[in-house]
């Protein structure tokens, strides 16, 4: 495997602008969810704070990824990916995910305002499972051996399947007590989360499927960024919508 990916000028600009778009999206959503807290009842503001934390953390890491991409290019359009202290650092994404994925799940539980015991149980199990999912995937991501990638990929899939079970079976059972419209919105929220998460294993499988080189690098950076925007920004805005719906159902006046 080469130490560099030779991009065309168009591919370089595409990734550069895609990462820039990811960065500003995270910043904008952080500001919006912070200033929107007075528009929901106090008990739902924790969910908006968590949403702001998610996009703030992601924004920081996108700034680091953006700078790393620029530094890895040197004076041309070839991106150094290993063998140098200025090589493009993909690990920033994993650091981001291991922090933000558990928080995403916690904010989904927080906005539903479930009974304390139920919320605590769901939170503990989902946080542990999501951390295991990301942590177990990283050794496979950095390995050059396909068999090693497959082993760690399978191990990472186990907590992923458990998260699906909790989201669709256990959390689903609690939605019957939610106000009109909330259950349907939460249902779409779960599908959004699972749909965007599907991008990550597809990108993970690229080397195993023999999809490498320039095109794989471009599609991986594009896919990761779009998935992050959907899973963090759109997810956070949907959390805000649910908080507004529940606040209105409990008597808060629309502004």
Where are these regions (language model features)?
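Alpha-helical transmembrane segments in multipass membrane proteins, preferentially the mid-helix core
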Residues: 28-32, 107, 136, 159-180, ...
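Internal transmembrane alpha-helix with an interfacial aromatic "cap," most often the third helix
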Residues: 30-34, 93-126, 134-142, 170
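Membrane-helix boundary/juxtamembrane motif in polytopic membrane proteins
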Residues: 120-125, 150, 171-195, 217
């Amino acid at each position: 495997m080469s130490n560099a990916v030779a991009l065309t000028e168009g591919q370089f600009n595409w990734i550069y602008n895609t990462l820039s778009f990811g960065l500003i999206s995270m910043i904008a959503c952080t500001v919006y969810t912070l200033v929107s807290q007075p528009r929901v009842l106090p008990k739902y503001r924790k969910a908006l704070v968590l949403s702001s934390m998610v996009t703030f953390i992601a924004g920081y890491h996108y700034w680091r990824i953006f700078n790393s991409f620029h530094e890895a290019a040197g004076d041309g359009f070839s991106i150094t990916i290993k063998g140098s202290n200025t090589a493009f650092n993909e690990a920033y994404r994993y650091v981001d995910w291991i922090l933000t994925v558990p928080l995403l799940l916690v904010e989904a539980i927080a906005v539903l305002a479930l009974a304390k015991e139920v919320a605590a149980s769901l939170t503990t199990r989902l946080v542990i499972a999501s951390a295991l999912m990301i942590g177990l995937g990283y050794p496979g991501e950095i390995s050059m051996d396909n068999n090693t990638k497959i082993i760690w990929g399978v191990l990472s899939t186990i907590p992923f399947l458990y998260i699906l079970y909790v989201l669709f079976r256990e959390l689903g059972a609690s939605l019957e007590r939610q106000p009109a419209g909330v259950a349907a919105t939460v249902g779409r929220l779960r599908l959004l989360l699972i749909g965007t998460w599907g991008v990550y294993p597809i990108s993970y499988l690229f080397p195993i499927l023999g999809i490498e080189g320039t095109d794989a690098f471009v599609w991986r950076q594009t896919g990761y960024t779009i998935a992050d925007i959907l899973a963090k920004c759109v997810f956070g805005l949907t959390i805000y919508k649910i908080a507004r719906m529940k606040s209105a159902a409990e008597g808060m006046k629309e502004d």
